Amino acid sequence: QTLFPYTTLFRSSSLMLAFLRDANTSASVIEIINLLDEVLGAKTFNSLFPVILTDNGSEFSNPKEIEKRSTIPCNRTKIFYCDPSAPYQKGACEVNHELIRRILPKGSSFDELTQQDITLMMNHINSYKRKKLNNRSPYETFSFYYGEDVLEKLACRQVPAKDIMLKENLLKKYFGTETSTIGG
């Protein structure tokens, strides 16, 4: 079975979440948005996702279903699309995608990975300090703005600086050696 990644970035902190999907469809994105809405609760979801900026991929072809809350008849967010061939409009996203490629080089298959593997990878990336965040990590910055309880709901864990690994061998299981993973 082919698996597809879905990432979402919180611009104020550069924290990125990533999810595996079993299809590259709008239904798979709606399922993730619904899950986030349920896990976070309406108030926190609305605070974190007032707007979703995305590309014009087919997985975002049903904006009304992404925008509306499934439990009550109201909108939970608003979808906006970047211009075609304009990745610079989501620059912070591209920086994190480059960090992902350090661990999973471009062209890597996600098919042997689990959500726990993806969460582990993102915990390492989100714990990596950035100059643009005044030498704080996305995890630390997000925690300052929104609190540890929200990070816990999102299955985010801080990785100590000395343990951060942004290399291919982080996910040894992917490369044929069984390993335990955290997160998920």
Task: Walk through the language-model features, giving the residues of each.
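Single conserved hydrophobic/aromatic residue that forms the stacking wall/gate
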Residues: 1-8
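Coil-to-beta-strand transition motifs
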Residues: 11-16
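Active-site beta-loop-alpha junctions of metal-dependent nucleic acid enzymes
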Residues: 18-43
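Active/binding-pocket-proximal capping segment
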Residues: 24-25, 35-36, 56, 68-75
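Short helix-terminating capping/connector loops at secondary-structure junctions
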Residues: 43-48, 74-76
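Hydrophobic "anchor" residues on beta-strands that sit immediately upstream
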Residues: 51
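RNase H-like two-metal-ion nuclease catalytic core shared by retroviral integrases
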Residues: 54-56, 63, 67-70, 79-104, ...
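C-terminal domain-tail junction helix/linker
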Residues: 106-184
